[in-house]
Amino acid sequence: MAMWVFGYGSLIWKTGFPFDESLPGFIKGYRRVFHQGSTDHRGTPDFPGRTVTLEAAHEEVCCGVAYKITKEEDKRDALLHLEVREKQYDQKEYLDFFTDSNASEPAVAGVMVYIASPDKKSNNNYLGPAPLEDIAKQIVKAKGPSGPNRDYLFNLEEALAQLGFKDKHVTDLANQVRHILSESEELDIDATAATANNV
């Protein structure tokens, strides 16, 4: 029996395990939010980054990619990889996956999904909601072993766009981060010019 894994964050563009088939599509009743703190990939314990998790949301959908894994050895390798990679995500759900918005039956039933819950007892890295500008400022500054937090956001934005998916939360956040970076560059240019004039 095949195992299916749903990716809605970095798994979309960086899978990290062997698979036999990938299907773009969506799950129902959830939305993607930058509410999970990352202290091991896109941030540090002293300054966490923010990565996506899923939040229950009636009548909303979360787009991503489902990966089919059939060989037993590949299943074991995938699970070993995911249990390390997603170790800060404290819930594992099995949800219906759709590829057609008009379909009443899922394309795949029971895709495995890693979710970081808001339960602080089981997930002490949960950061929760915050104003868009505050989340953007945190993402601009944070970086970890896997690289700058902003790269995670921009990679997600690009990966979704390449699949033809739109996610307002991701787009708005990416635009806010670009705005902050643009302002920072302008300040750097002004400071450099002022220093040059004083030499």
UniProtKB/Swiss-Prot annotation:
GO-annotated biological processes: glutathione catabolic process
Keywords noted in UniProt: Cytoplasm, Lyase
Family matches, as Gene3D superfamilies: Gamma-glutamyl cyclotransferase-like
Subcellular location: Cytoplasm
Annotated catalytic residues: 86
SUPFAM superfamilies in alphabetical order: Gamma-glutamyl cyclotransferase-like
Gene Ontology molecular function: any one: glutathione specific gamma-glutamylcyclotransferase activity
Binding site for substrate: 5-10
Source taxon at top rank: Eukaryota
Gene Ontology cellular component annotations, sorted alphabetically: cytoplasm; cytosol
Free-text comment on the cofactor: Binds 2 Mn(2+) ions per subunit.
Catalytic activity: glutathione = L-cysteinylglycine + 5-oxo-L-proline
Family the entry assigns: Belongs to the gamma-glutamylcyclotransferase family.
Protein's name in the database: Gamma-glutamylcyclotransferase 2-3
Organism in which the protein naturally occurs: Arabidopsis thaliana (Mouse-ear cress)
Gene name for this UniProt entry: GGCT2;3
